[in-house]
Amino acid sequence: LEVSTGMILDILARKPFWDRDLNFNHGTGHGVGYLLNIHEGPAGFRWKYRKGETEVLQEGMVITDEPGIYIEGSHGIRLENELLTCKGTLNEYGQFMYFEAITLIPMDLDAINPDIMTQEDKKLLNDYHAKVYEVIAPYLNEEEQEWLKKYTRAI
């Protein structure tokens, strides 16, 4: 909803980790400044309260989405995309919002185990990859398009 803060939404990103008694000790995301300040308010996704950080997400705000997990002595992974905050449905419950990915690069399919993904997870990844190909391919030559097609294939 339009009245949501990043702190409210942060728990949604953490839920799959918390369900497995895991956590990441960094923010889920942060605002990106128009002068390219990488950590710029007023909005962000954090699980720890910071005084004065009550800014609601508004249309046009660019926010990063960067959950990750680090297993000491083993491995770590962190995905980071930039998202544009957009207005969605307006109804009797309020103005709903959604995020549009604006960082359009393929996810490394060799590092993904589709056997542990839900159908919804697969659909999200496949839809994202279809958008990556659709938007980026027209700017590439034929050889580059073939490379992109391989790395944005459906799973």
Model-derived features: where do they sit?
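Active-site neighborhoods and metal-handling regions in enzymes and metal-associated proteins
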Residues: 1-155
